[in-house]
Amino acid sequence: MKPQLVIADDEADICRLIKFLLRSYDLSEAQNGKRALELIREVQPDLALLDVMMPEMTGLEVLDAVRGNPLTAPIPIILLSAKGQVAEIEQGLQSGATRYLVKPFEPLALRTCVAEVLQESHHQPVKE
């Protein structure tokens, strides 16, 4: 069975790129933080990728809600953001993100990061 991922980004082009790069996984998509949180609660994915700056709820707010719920707290979360200052990256990681990738990211870096996080969380990555 393919690992289930939730992808949340309000930029349609970024979502399309991520979906293309991670097409070997079972993907659910949200364009805002509120919907991302709903999907994470419904789907209980193996991994979530959240943009930091989204409407309705930021990625950090979604992260906080996920970590605050015992049912969703163990889900690995990769934050994606154009904000690449050291303080912002540290804030994301200290808030409970598993990883933090700065946009624009290299396609191979995203795929590698997802595979590593899934492997670390004891899910077998999908071979392409």
Label each region the model flagged:
Residues 2-12, 18, 48:
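Conserved acidic segment of CheY-like receiver
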Residues 105-114:
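C-terminal output helix
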Residues 12-28:
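Two-component/phosphorelay signaling modules centered on CheY-like receiver
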Residues 29-47:
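Acidic, metal-coordinating helix/loop segments flanking the phosphotransfer/catalytic sites
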Residues 54:
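Receiver (REC) domain active-site loop signature in two-component systems and cognate sites
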